[in-house]
């Protein structure tokens, strides 16, 4: 009831202004351990059936917040309090950048979806590291999503990813290389097997922490499988599928620029993930993201082969009790099918 009133006010504002107001509150909350405990007592949820150790990291539950919400790693403590099993901060770039021109964030309310053309706006890796360390250590795993600066030419992309990773080596529990945002010119062209191989070979020499590749939902299936295979062969520990889509047919009134996320992406993301899991389940850690807004969809993705999940748009539309609702209902679904833990259900449809 309370969030419905808050949501009504926030949705009366420009989408990016509303987001920044929420971020200001979350940054303030992060500075207060007492308030974070209070939030967690209201909206957190803990159940041993949902716990899992993956790549040496202990996840209290499989539901994470996707990159893009906390771009500068400045409100992680407050976000954890809402019940997420892990968070992904960023996207951070080596040098600060302002992103694309405003307006660049839009709501498609009927479809419970968002369209963003942000363009990796962030304060840069140095300040991101400083913000991260302010409240570290954290109670859940934290991933760091890394991107290329807009002004860097393709020929120097590998050096740029090397530079931003180097800046972030002392923060986070895993790293995700973002080659799939549609909002940096030509970035998606880097989703080819040669560059991906070079990228992960380079990264494996720099860190022993887990490395993930985040892919676009708009790749042809064969191309996607080729790129993913190249990443895994070069040392990638996991694949995150998927980023936002540029398929404008999924909403009634799309804007010219930007990627779509939310419910409009559910079917497309699920189909891509199904093909990914058929080829790479048990060969890599698979993370499903895109249009997950309830326990039923979360459970389907887990049975399809997802060890972990991420949400974003649904958190905007459904509010702070979303994690708790999904996780409680997920436990019921596991029990109904006779699974003793979420770990047992991963990939059940493939067995």
Curated annotation (Swiss-Prot):
EC number: 1.3.5.2
One Gene Ontology term from the biological process aspect of the record: 'de novo' pyrimidine nucleobase biosynthetic process
Binding site for substrate: 71, 116-120, 178, 183, 243-244
Keywords: Cell membrane, Flavoprotein, FMN, Membrane, Oxidoreductase, Pyrimidine biosynthesis
ATP-binding keyword on record: no
Annotated Gene Ontology cellular component terms: cytoplasm; plasma membrane
Keyword hit for Flavoprotein: yes
Catalytic function, reaction form: (S)-dihydroorotate + a quinone = orotate + a quinol
Residues annotated as binding FMN: 67-71, 91, 145, 178, 214, 242, 262, 291, 312-313
Membrane-spanning intervals of the chain: none
Cofactor: binding comment: Binds 1 FMN per subunit.
Pathway: Pyrimidine metabolism; UMP biosynthesis via de novo pathway; orotate from (S)-dihydroorotate (quinone route): step 1/1
Subcellular location, record wording: Cell membrane
Membrane topology: Peripheral membrane protein
CC cofactor: FMN
EC category name: oxidoreductase
A GO term, aspect molecular function: dihydroorotate dehydrogenase (quinone) activity
InterPro entries in the record: Aldolase_TIM, DHO_dehydrogenase, Dihydroorotate_DH_1_2, Dihydroorotate_DH_2, Dihydroorotate_DH_cat, Dihydroorotate_DH_CS
Active-site residues from the entry: 181
UniProt-listed PROSITE patterns: DHODEHASE_1 (PS00911), DHODEHASE_2 (PS00912)
Main function: Catalyzes the conversion of dihydroorotate to orotate with quinone as electron acceptor.
Family label: Belongs to the dihydroorotate dehydrogenase family. Type 2 subfamily.
Subunit relationships: Monomer.
Protein name as it appears in the record: Dihydroorotate dehydrogenase (quinone)
């Amino acid at each position: 009831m309370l969030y419905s009133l808050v949501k009504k006010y926030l949705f009366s504002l420009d989408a990016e202004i509303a987001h920044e107001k929420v971020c200001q509150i979350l940054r303030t909350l992060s500075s207060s351990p007492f308030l974070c405990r209070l939030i967690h007592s209201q909206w957190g949820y803990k159940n041993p059936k949902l716990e899992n150790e993956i790549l040496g990291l202990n996840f209290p539950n499989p539901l994470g917040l996707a990159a893009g919400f906390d771009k500068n790693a400045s409100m992680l403590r407050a976000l954890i309090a809402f019940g997420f099993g892990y968070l992904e901060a960023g996207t951070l770039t080596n040098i600060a950048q302002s992103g694309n021109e405003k307006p660049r964030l839009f709501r498609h309310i009927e479809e419970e979806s968002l369209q963003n053309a942000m363009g990796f706006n962030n304060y840069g890796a140095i300040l991101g590291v400083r913000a991260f360390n302010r409240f570290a250590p954290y109670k859940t795993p934290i991933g760091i999503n890394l991107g290329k600066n807009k002004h860097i030419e393709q020929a120097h992309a590998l050096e740029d990813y090397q530079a931003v990773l180097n800046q972030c080596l002392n923060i986070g529990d895993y790293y995700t290389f973002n080659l799939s945002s549609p909002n940096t010119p030509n970035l998606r062209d880097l989703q080819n097997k040669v560059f991906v191989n070079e990228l992960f070979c380079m990264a494996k020499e720099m860190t022993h922490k887990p490395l993930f590749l985040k892919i676009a939902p708009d790749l042809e299936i064969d191309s996607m499988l080729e790129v993913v295979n190249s990443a895994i062969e070069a040392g990638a520990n996991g694949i995150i599928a998927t980023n936002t889509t540029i398929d404008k047919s999924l909403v009634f009134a799309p804007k010219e620029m930007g990627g779509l996320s939310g419910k409009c992406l559910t079917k497309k993301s699920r189909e891509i993930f199904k093909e990914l899991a058929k080829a790479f389940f048990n060969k890599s850690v698979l993370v499903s993201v895109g249009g997950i807004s309830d326990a039923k969809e979360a459970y389907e993705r887990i049975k399809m082969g997802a060890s972990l999940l991420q949400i974003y748009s649904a958190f905007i539309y459904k509010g702070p009790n979303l994690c708790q609702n999904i996780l409680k209902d997920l436990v019921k679904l596991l029990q109904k099918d006779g699974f003793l833990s979420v770990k047992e259900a991963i990939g059940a449809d493939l067995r």
